[in-house]
Swiss-Prot record:
Residues 6-76, 93-169 form the DED domain. InterPro entries: DEATH-like_dom_sf (IPR011029), DED_dom (IPR001875). Interacts (via C-terminus) with host HSP90AA1. Interacts (via N-terminus) with host CASP8. Interacts with host FADD. Keywords: Host-virus interaction, Inhibition of host NF-kappa-B by virus. GO terms for biological process: regulation of apoptotic process; symbiont-mediated suppression of host apoptosis; symbiont-mediated suppression of host NF-kappaB cascade. This is Protein MC160. It comes from the Viruses. Plays a role in inhibition of host innate immune response. Reduces TNF-alpha-mediated NF-kappa-B activation. Interferes with IKK kinase activity and reduces the phosphorylation of both components CHUK/IKKA and IKBKB/IKKB. Gene3D superfamilies: Death Domain, Fas (1.10.533.10).
Length: 371
């Protein structure tokens, strides 16, 4: 029953279920038996006249098209059952291979292959798939089942070496293509990375104030600007210095200062004033026209005096107290110190002159006693 001819009326309904590309593949598969056929219907008619259109050959054609659904609906045959009928038809391994790689070549690759073929193709030839291109090259005599060198070259032009190798092996009889089994792409070489050797760790500097000392001679070597840093060894003998930065330091400061550093201040801007027995007065006179404001907080028994010294001096702050004694002080102030730092205490300073002060630290001048 597998070798009995199939009525053509039955095949017309079968062809209606195939699309245009499958018609082209079906016609290409029958070219060895019906080379002059122009359509799939003509190819099947030629097979029927030669009594080659049997159930086994039809199962082989549908398996090559991978239409197992049609095979089951029209013939009631499963894929496993159809596999037992294969290998007894008229299909060559070369045509089965080309049909298998037909869907693996995209439209862009097909366009490049047509351009590379050049004058081998007729001017009016516009292939829509790979089997159309192969059929046109066969008509031109450039390709045959025994000579596929031109097709291999075209596949190399689009870097499809996997398809060209499989096609060459089939053409030379070194490989057999199973019907309905497309050629799988060869796996690409994977670069293996040896993870046994750990990567070299890089010392991380996550905290602010950790700097790399490129030219440090030793761990205890003094740094520039009188700053001191603690040097530790990390990584490959690299020296790291950690500095204790505070919020009171300016942002451009890198190294912390161990002790307060007092810059040389021109003391000519301060005037030593002598107070009488009845009152004591501190006078800070600035020689420039633009001087700063000095605010003194006075209690109930003290008087606040803000006097303008004129064009050459800015403000005079005097705190008077009838019971205060004479006191002379010389101060040196640095503007670089923070306001919340009182600095060294002034020796021998009597605070009774300030009366009931709300905050002593707010009234003290930022001074350093000179001895």
């Amino acid at each position: 029953m597998a070798h009995e001819p199939i009525p053509f009326s039955f095949l017309r309904n079968l062809l209606a279920e195939l699309d245009a590309s499958e018609h082209e593949v079906l016609r290409f598969l029958c070219r060895d038996v019906a080379p002059a056929s122009k359509t799939a219907e003509d190819a099947l008619r030629a097979l029927q006249r030669r009594r080659l259109l049997t159930l086994s050959s039809m199962a082989e054609l549908l398996c090559a098209l991978r239409r197992f659904d049609v095979l089951k609906v029209r013939f009631g045959m499963t894929r496993e059952c159809a596999g037992r009928l294969l290998g007894h038809g008229f299909l060559s391994q070369y045509r089965l291979q080309v049909a298998a790689i037909n869907n693996m070549v995209g439209s862009e690759d097909l366009r490049v292959m047509c351009l590379c073929a050049g004058k081998l193709l007729p001017p009016s030839c516009t292939p829509r798939c790979l089997v159309d291109l192969v059929s046109a090259l066969e008509d031109a005599g450039a390709i045959s089942p025994q000579d596929v060198s031109v097709l291999v070259t075209l596949l190399h032009a689009v870097c499809r070496y996997d398809l060209s190798v499989a096609l060459s092996a089939v053409a030379h009889g070194h490989m057999t293509v199973g019907v309905g089994t497309p050629v799988q792409d060869e796996p690409m070489d994977v670069l293996e990375v040896d993870d046994a050797e750990p990567m070299e760790a890089t010392p991380a500097c996550d905290e602010i104030g950790v700097v790399k000392l490129a030219g440090a001679a030793s761990a205890g070597a003094p740094l520039a600007d009188g700053a001191f840093a603690a040097c530790t060894s990390a990584g490959k003998g690299e020296d790291l210095a950690t500095s204790d930065l505070t919020d009171s330091e300016p942002e451009d400061s890198v190294f912390a200062v161990a002790d307060p550093v007092y810059a040389d201040v021109d003391l000519s801007m301060f005037v030593r004033a002598n107070a009488t027995a009845d009152s004591s007065m501190f006078v800070n006179a600035d020689a420039g026209a633009d001087s700063s404001l000095v605010n003194a907080d006075a209690g109930a028994d003290s008087s606040l005096v803000n006097a303008d010294a004129g064009a050459d001096s800015s403000l005079v702050n005097a705190v008077a107290d009838a019971n205060s004694s004479l006191m002379r002080t010389t101060s040196a102030c640095t503007d670089s110190e923070p306001e919340d730092s009182a600095g060294p205490s002034c020796a021998g300073m009597a605070l009774s002159m300030f009366g009931r002060a709300k905050s002593v630290s707010s009234l003290l001048l930022r001074t350093k006693a000179s001895y």
